[in-house]
C-alpha cells in the first residue's frame, strides 16, 4: 500500500508510520514540524515538508490525515488559525490525491461535548470549542465528498489518546504532562476539582483502528475504551507508576473544558472487529518506561 500520513512526525502519526513501515508499506510523511519532531521520523519514510494550509499533491492509495492544530485553548484564542489548519487544511488533503481514501482523525471528546452516558456515533455533535467545531466541519467535508464523488473516506472520532511520543507541551497531553512533572518531582496541576473524566486510549490501539478501516468505507467510528477515568484517578495512577507519593495542585477550571467525555465503541467493535487491548495501568507503565529510556543520559 502507498500511504501518506499528514502529521507523520507527530505523536499518533509517527507511531502509525512505524507500523505501516513494519508491514512493508510505502510511506510518505507530510509535516511542517509546527508540533511534530524530526527525531520521531523513520529514515525509511519519505518526507514532504509542507504546511497543509497550502495546497499540495501526492501519490497515494490512502491518506491518513492526522495533521492538526490540536490545542483547545489555542483554538479559543486564535479560532482563525485553528480553522485554517483544521478546516482549510482538510480540504487541501481531500484534493491532494484524487482517488485516494482519506482517513480523518476527528475528535470524540471535543465533538460530543458533555456526556451523561457514553456517546455513540448517533449522539449529536455539540462542540464547545472552535477546535471541536473545526473537527465537525472536517467530518462534514469527508461525508460530502463521499456523496458528491463516490469516495470511501472515513472519520475516526478519537477519545483521549496517550502513549510514547506524546507532547507534554500540548494541554491535551495530560498523561505526558502528569508523568513528566512527577519525574521532575513537581506536583501535577489539575484544573477544577479533578472530578472531570476522560476516556483514555493507548496509542497502539489507535494505530490499529486506523489500519483496520484502511481500504473500507463506513463510519464514522468512535475509537476509545468505553470507560472513563477522572483526572484525580489519573493523577494517582500516574503517581503509582512513577513510584512517588504526591498530591496534585488545583487551579480554576478553564474555558472550553468539558466535565465528562466517554465514548461508546460498539459500532467499530461490531462492524470492524476492533477493540482496545491495552489497559490504562499497562499503558501508563509502557509510557513511563519509554520516558525513562528517552531521557538523555
Name what the model sees in each region.
Residues 74-75, 123, 151-167, 177-201, ...:
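A conserved pocket-lining segment of Rossmann-fold NAD(P)-dependent short-chain dehydrogenase/reductase
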Residues 106-107, 114, 173, 196, ...:
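A conserved catalytic-core signature of glycosyltransferases
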Residues 130, 138, 171, 231, ...:
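Conserved donor sugar-nucleotide recognition element shared by glycan-biosynthetic enzymes
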Residues 1-161, 210:
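N-terminal Rossmann-like NAD(P)+-binding domain of SDR-like oxidoreductases, especially those catalyzing
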Residues 182-297:
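C-terminal substrate-binding subdomain of Rossmann-fold SDR/epimerase-dehydratase oxidoreductases
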Amino acid at each position: 500500500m502507498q500511504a501518506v500520513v499528514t502529521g507523520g512526525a507527530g505523536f499518533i502519526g509517527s507511531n502509525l508510520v512505524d507500523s505501516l513501515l513494519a508491514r512493508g508499506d510505502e510511506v510518505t510523511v507530510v509535516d511542517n514540524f509546527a508540533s511534530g519532531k524530526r527525531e520521531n521520523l523513520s529514515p525509511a519514510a519519505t518526507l514532504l515538508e509542507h504546511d497543509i494550509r497550502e495546497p499540495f499533491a501526492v501519490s497515494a492509495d490512502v491518506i491518513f490525515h492526522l495533521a492538526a492544530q490540536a490545542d483547545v485553548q489555542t483554538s479559543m484564542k486564535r479560532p482563525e488559525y485553528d480553522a485554517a489548519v483544521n478546516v482549510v487544511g482538510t480540504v487541501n488533503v481531500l484534493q491532494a490525491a484524487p482517488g485516494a481514501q482519506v482517513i480523518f482523525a476527528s475528535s470524540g471528546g471535543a465533538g460530543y461535548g458533555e456526556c451523561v452516558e457514553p456517546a455513540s456515533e448517533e449522539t449529536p455533535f455539540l462542540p464547545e470549542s472552535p477546535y471541536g467545531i473545526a473537527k465537525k466541519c472536517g467530518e462534514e467535508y469527508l461525508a460530502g465528498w463521499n456523496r458528491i464523488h463516490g469516495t470511501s473516506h472515513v472519520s475516526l472520532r478519537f477519545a483521549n489518546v496517550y502513549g510514547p511520543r506524546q507532547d507534554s507541551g500540548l494541554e491535551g497531553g495530560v498523561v505526558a504532562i502528569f508523568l513528566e512533572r512527577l519525574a521532575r518531582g513537581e506536583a501535577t496541576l489539575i484544573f477544577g476539582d479533578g472530578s472531570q473524566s476522560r476516556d483514555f486510549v493507548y496509542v497502539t490501539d489507535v494505530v490499529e483502528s486506523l489500519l483496520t478501516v484502511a481500504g473500507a468505507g463506513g463510519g464514522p467510528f468512535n475509537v476509545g475504551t468505553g470507560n472513563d477515568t477522572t483526572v484525580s484517578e489519573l493523577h494517582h495512577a500516574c503517581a503509582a507508576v512513577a513510584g512517588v507519593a504526591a498530591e496534585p495542585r488545583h487551579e480554576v477550571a478553564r474555558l472550553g473544558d468539558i466535565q465528562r467525555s466517554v465514548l461508546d465503541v460498539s459500532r467499530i467493535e461490531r462492524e470492524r472487529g476492533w477493540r482496545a487491548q491495552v489497559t490504562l495501568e499497562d499503558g501508563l507503565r509502557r509510557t513511563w518506561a519509554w520516558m525513562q529510556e528517552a531521557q538523555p543520559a
